[in-house]
Amino acid sequence: MPFITEIKTFAALGSGVIGSGWVARALAHGLDVVAWDPAPGAEQALRKRVANAWPALEKQGLAPGASQDRLKFVATIEECVRNADFIQESAPERLDLKLDLHAKISAAAKPDAIIGSSTSGLLPSEFYESSTHPERCVVGHPFNPVYLLPLVEIVGGSRTSPEAIEAAKTIYTALGMRPLHVRKEVPGFIADRLLEALWREALHLVNDGVATTGEIDDAIRFGAGLRWSFMGTFLTYTLAGGDAGMRHFMSQFGPALKLPWTYLPAPELTDKLIDDVVSGTSEQQGERSIAALERYRDDTLLAVLEAVKSSKASHGLSFSD
């Protein structure tokens, strides 16, 4: 069955931080958006989040016809998905909830509409088990803020068709995203597994009194983080090998991997560790509100994205290279 890839109506189920990010991105790309969330006050909170994201999206550039007025909030799942060309679910990470939700979504949706889930911790084969037409169901795992960061990890379940993966790539690309197909259905996918390893080490460093949260963040943002934003890990280490490249790097520094520098198990989240982390991040935040920090993050991300795009273009590369 051919799947819909030219999207006019985008359905969003769940309107928290991630769901509202999808809504803002879809609206900015000139789509009609139908949203549903059963939580009290959800519509008001969603419209506020979209309004907060809009200045950054205006700076990035809106598609013709893009408007916050093209958002419609509805009372039922069926009304949300019935006429949608694409569906993105961003509900809480509970298997029982997602099983029930996707049974209802898939029963009411067009049979050729791709259904994506924003899950970061559940596997698609599990929560799409009771879905109608499971061959069109994928994970589309984004990163916050969804309306600015381009990466989306696409994961298929045991019954997802290859055609659905390709259709999802096309849809997410049209939304200005950089789709990354995760070849195997594994917990944590790709990016979160890397981030969790770094997070565990950071917690150990705080717990052992080696560094404060601010010092750890400085180690990233003034060091490797700058390189990671445009080269990633492997290409960075290729340069560390000199003219001989990665093979020399592996032979020279590979044995260091066996040194007992790092921990694999996470530290126990004691009250003291939690207090130390909260105290440290509160000091970093200072008098700035969360809203002010979000504006700072968005403006800086826009500048970084534009700088990376411009520099790549000068070297004959596209942004996604």
From Swiss-Prot:
Catalytic activity entry: carnitine + NAD(+) = 3-dehydrocarnitine + NADH + H(+)
Q: Where in the cell?
A: Cytoplasm
Entry's NCBIfam families? PRK07066.1 (NF005471)
Q: Matching SUPFAM superfamilies, A to Z?
A: 6-phosphogluconate dehydrogenase C-terminal domain-like (SSF48179), NAD(P)-binding Rossmann-fold domains (SSF51735)
Top-level EC class as recorded in UniProt: oxidoreductase
The record describes the protein's role as:
Catalyzes the NAD(+)-dependent oxidation of L-carnitine to 3-dehydrocarnitine.
What's the name of the protein?
A: L-carnitine dehydrogenase
Give the record's family classification.
Belongs to the 3-hydroxyacyl-CoA dehydrogenase family. L-carnitine dehydrogenase subfamily.
What biological-process GO terms show up in the record?
A: carnitine metabolic process; catabolic process; fatty acid metabolic process
